[in-house]
């Protein structure tokens, strides 16, 4: 499995701001979008382009365009919605597929409750967004759903990832690509990433 920890100074700076215990909802939400945008930029570096001829201001000119790669962005509800706009800034024509999965606080197992995928998801590159890759359970379940629907090309964007989640994802889906702003230290006894971001969903939505 390809794992990319994006070490750009802007990514590290913005993620550092997000780690503050007293960050407000407005700033956390904005930074989640900004870091999601920067991760998208990194994840899109291998998209193929082709030359097309257009009418320029001084006549015909050849320009590069993305070559026939259709995209669907897949936010995992609910926290993934906080990163979705960062992807759409660069790929505004992407279709939106939604997967609702929550983690049982006692068993830490993923529990699916809603799925609405793009009609032609099997023809698209799926970019899954979720702030945290902790145990990996929710992400693995989401990828399972996408593959069962025929999706073959999948990339994952997360703000922070735990080694435990990366290992689980590698074991379950070695063919996907993972892009993260940080590989953090470990999971604590409650299944939270350390140092992590706290509860990203609560911080994005202003709930507790």
Curated annotation (Swiss-Prot):
Pathway: Pyrimidine metabolism; UMP biosynthesis via salvage pathway; UMP from uracil: step 1/1. Keywords: Allosteric enzyme, Glycosyltransferase, GTP-binding, Magnesium, Nucleotide-binding, Transferase. Signal peptide: none annotated. CDD domains: PRTases_typeI. GO terms for biological process: UMP salvage; uracil salvage. It holds the Pfam family UPRTase. 5-phospho-alpha-D-ribose 1-diphosphate binds at residues 78, 103, 130-138, 199. Its EC number is 2.4.2.9. The keyword Nucleotide-binding applies. InterPro entries: PRibTrfase_dom, PRTase-like, Upp_B, UPRTase/APRTase, Ura_phspho_trans. Uracil binds at residues 193, 198-200. Binds 1 Mg(2+) ion per subunit. The magnesium is bound as Mg-PRPP. It is an enzyme of class 2 (transferase). It catalyses: UMP + diphosphate = 5-phospho-alpha-D-ribose 1-diphosphate + uracil. Allosterically activated by GTP. Its cofactor is Mg(2+). GO terms for molecular function: GTP binding; magnesium ion binding; uracil phosphoribosyltransferase activity. Belongs to the UPRTase family. Catalyzes the conversion of uracil and 5-phospho-alpha-D-ribose 1-diphosphate (PRPP) to UMP and diphosphate. This is Uracil phosphoribosyltransferase. It comes from Haemophilus ducreyi (strain 35000HP / ATCC 700724). The lineage of its organism: Bacteria, Pseudomonadati, Pseudomonadota, Gammaproteobacteria, Pasteurellales.
């Amino acid at each position: 499995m390809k794992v990319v920890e994006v070490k750009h100074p802007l990514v590290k700076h913005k993620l550092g701001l997000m780690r503050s215990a007293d960050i407000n909802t407005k700033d956390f939400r904005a930074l989640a979008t900004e870091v999601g945008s920067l991760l998208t930029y990194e994840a899109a570096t291998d998209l193929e382009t082709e030359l097309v001829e257009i009418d320029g201001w001084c006549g015909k000119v050849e320009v590069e365009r993305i070559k026939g790669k259709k995209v669907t962005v897949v936010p995992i509800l609910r926290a993934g919605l906080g990163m979705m706009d960062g992807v759409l800034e660069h790929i505004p024509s992407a279709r939106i597929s939604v997967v609702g999965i929550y983690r049982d606080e006692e068993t830490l197992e993923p529990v699916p409750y809603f799925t609405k995928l793009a009609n032609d998801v099997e023809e698209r590159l799926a970019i899954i967004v979720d702030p945290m890759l902790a145990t990996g359970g929710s992400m693995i379940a989401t990828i399972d759903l996408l593959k069962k629907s025929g999706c073959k090309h999948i990339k994952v964007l997360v703000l922070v990832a735990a080694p435990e989640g990366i290992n689980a994802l590698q074991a379950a889906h070695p063919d996907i690509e993972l892009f993260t702003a940080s590989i953090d230290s470990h999971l604590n006894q409650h299944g939270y990433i350390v140092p992590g971001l706290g509860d990203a969903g609560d911080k994005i939505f202003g709930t507790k």
